[in-house]
Amino acid sequence: GQVGWELQRALAPLGRITAVDFDSTDYCGDFSKPAGVAETVRLVKPDVIVNAAAHTAVDKAESEREFAELLNATSVAAIAKEAEALGAWLVHYSTDYVFDGSGERPWVENDQTAPLNVYGETKLAGEQAAALCARHLIFRTSWVYAARGANFAKTMLRFGKERSEMSVINDQFGAPTGAELLADCTAHAIRTAQAKPEVAGLYHLIASGTTTWFDYAQLVFAKARAAGVELAVTQVNAVPTSAFPTPAKRPHNSRLDTTKFQRTFNLRLPDWTVGVERMLTEILGK
């Protein structure tokens, strides 16, 4: 996936990397096979395991709970047990979807969890599974994107070229977070954790600032026009979440408070526009 790809770059200077995914033939990277991924850990005997695999099809998860549970929780538990036996570190990614998305205040790590959907429920179970390994770093993130593969900006650009009028949701709040940023922060955190094991725990990790999908789309269109891209869209309507009914409920408030992460790892998280503008430069230049 997008984060896994960036991790291969960011983690390279830390040591020898064994990258495993669903299609791997040398080791099992198929998270629908908990025994297989557990065996991979036993065979590789890593010092650090970074798990960027997940069932992220939020709406699909509503109708395939067992499969989502297998990928997001059962296999995580299998890996965590092997990691604990090895004395290895386990780095795992979670989501703001573990919360109910209410209010306007950024969520802190120890706020009450109450997932709105199956995806959130299985990811919460995954956090609890990852914590079976004492040396764990769990990073809750949100609105993840990358220049590589599909993303919201590319979808907006495609629609913006085809349609004169568009409607975009304006009552969900969060911070688009680049896979690059996640991977780089993960590498820093691993370095710190290896020297200071007491930093083990749960952290919120997203870019700084807040936006809505509507404002995010407006930035995409402004940058595209500035780059000379011809867009058909002349009217963009701000609409509520209720205008786009989906099988899975979406949170209104995806803001995460990253104070703990920034203090612990002595890092400053850039504003969300920094990474998004960089990604746009990359995709518009192609």
Regions from the PLM with identified roles:
Residues 272-286:
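Amphipathic terminal alpha-helices
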Residues 31-71:
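NAD(P)H-binding glycine-rich loop region in Rossmannoid oxidoreductase-like domains
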Residues 20-35:
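Rossmann-fold cofactor-recognition segment
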Residues 49, 63-91:
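NAD(P)-cofactor binding segment of oxidoreductase domains
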